[in-house]
Swiss-Prot record:
Pfam family, any one: DAC
Record-given protein name: DNA integrity scanning protein DisA
Signal peptide from the UniProt entry: none
Organism this protein belongs to: Clostridium botulinum (strain 657 / Type Ba4)
Keyword Transmembrane helix tagged: no
Entries under InterPro entries matching the protein: DisA, DisA_sf, DNA_integrity_DisA_N_sf, DNA_integrity_scan_DisA_link, DNA_integrity_scan_DisA_N, DNA_integrity_scanning_protein, RuvA_2-like
Organismal lineage: Bacteria, Bacillati, Bacillota, Clostridia, Eubacteriales
Binding residues annotated for ATP, in chain numbering: 73, 91, 104-108
This protein's UniProt keywords: ATP-binding, DNA damage, DNA repair, DNA-binding, Magnesium, Nucleotide-binding, Nucleotidyltransferase, Transferase
Length: 353
């Protein structure tokens, strides 16, 4: 449910991640210091900009691309990256398209990308860097060792943030079972959950850019976060005003800047509490998050429970007969819910000690 802000960039990075045939060809050109200009796409709009060159129309191969890059012109690849269409071609984009690039190769790449929306790759001969353009996007591909170092640093930061989130959530769990949770406790948990998810998004981009070299980072990330996002969403469902859509609230929180996220009063307004003291306002959870922790309770049953009892404390105080009357809950499931909540409470109180 995260907003996919960099979806297009992530798709580009997947195509040219280390281990892919395209990246291998680009690395070969980079090592040879010949420079190069490649355009990915075979639409009529792209082919109209191609002037001269040789029609190749052969299977794509990293070694072929490397050899063809020794010539001055650009290389045109099919959009599925399976064929090399032509080489040593000149690209003639609209010269009125604004560009802030310097150097003929990069100016051409930027203009072609803006005009056609295709992926254009410029490899600098002197600076020895690979720059990718698509529409208004410009991205410089970095060496895997640099990305790996940054990913490891981000993982270390994530570990610390997850540890803080765990402490905040464990404290909230205790307060929820005692029914003395304050708005401050709830907002702190929501805030910390979003902070963790922002670091996760950054690491996911590194993993995408690392390709097959990012497997270990991916495994470590999966181990660290587990159900952080799901719990964060359930927190919002537990405490937002009943007339508000939790999905819209979650999107709003994702759209906050780092400074805005630190402002708990601003977060309070987003979940529907305006002008109330955060520390003194007691609020009760609906129970989505806690009941979700009980094994083998379907989501539709949780919805029915919350609709019937409105608050977690009412679910806990309900008799077996009252639970049995809820649609989707029989005698066995009523016992499972009562026993599950009791065990959860005992476990949380033990963890406190």
């Amino acid at each position: 449910m995260r907003i996919e802000k960099d979806k297009e960039l992530m798709n580009i990075l997947k195509i040219m991640a280390p281990g892919t045939p395209l990246r291998e060809g680009l690395e070969n050109i980079l090592r040879a210091k010949t420079g190069g200009l490649l355009i990915l796409g075979d639409s009529d709009q792209i082919l109209k900009l191609v002037d001269g060159g040789f029609k190749i129309n052969s299977e794509y191969s990293p070694s072929y691309v490397y050899e063809l890059a020794k010539m001055d012109g650009s290389i045109v690849l099919s959009s599925d990256l399976k064929k090399i269409l032509c080489a040593n071609a000149q690209l003639i984009p609209d010269s009125s398209i604004p560009t802030f690039e310097t150097g003929t190769r990069h100016r051409t790449a930027d203009r072609v990308a803006k005009q056609t929306g295709a992926i254009v790759i410029a490899i600098s001969q002197r600076r020895n860097i690979i720059t990718v353009y698509k529409g208004g996007i410009k991205y410089v591909l970095r060496d895997s060792s640099i990305i790996l170092a940054r990913a490891n640093q981000a993982l270390q930061t994530l570990e610390k943030y997850v540890a803080v989130l765990d402490r905040v959530v464990n404290n909230l769990n205790i307060l929820e079972f005692k029914d003395i949770a304050t708005l401050f406790d709830v907002l702190t948990a929501i805030q910390r959950s979003e902070m963790v998810m922002r670091i996760v998004s950054e690491i996911e981009r590194y993993i995408c850019e690392l390709g097959n070299e990012g497997r270990l980072i991916d495994m470590q990330l999966s181990e660290l976060i587990k159900s952080v996002e799901e719990d964060g969403i359930l927190l919002i469902r537990d405490y937002c005003r009943s007339n508000m859509e939790y999905e819209d609230i979650y999107k709003q929180i994702q759209g906050l800047s780092s400074e805005e996220l630190l402002n708990l009063d601003g977060l309070s307004k987003i979940i529907g509490y305006t002008g109330v003291p955060l520390v003194d306002t007691l609020i009760s959870p609906r129970g989505y998050r806690m009941i979700n922790k009980i094994p083998r309770i379907p989501s539709n049953v949780i919805e029915n429970l919350v609709a019937n009892f409105n608050q977690l404390k009412c679910v806990m105080e309900a008799s077996y007969e009252q639970l049995d009357n809820v649609e989707g809950i029989g005698e066995a499931r009523a016992k499972a819910i009562k026993n599950g909540l009791r065990r959860l409470r005992e476990q949380i109180m033990l963890d406190k000690v």
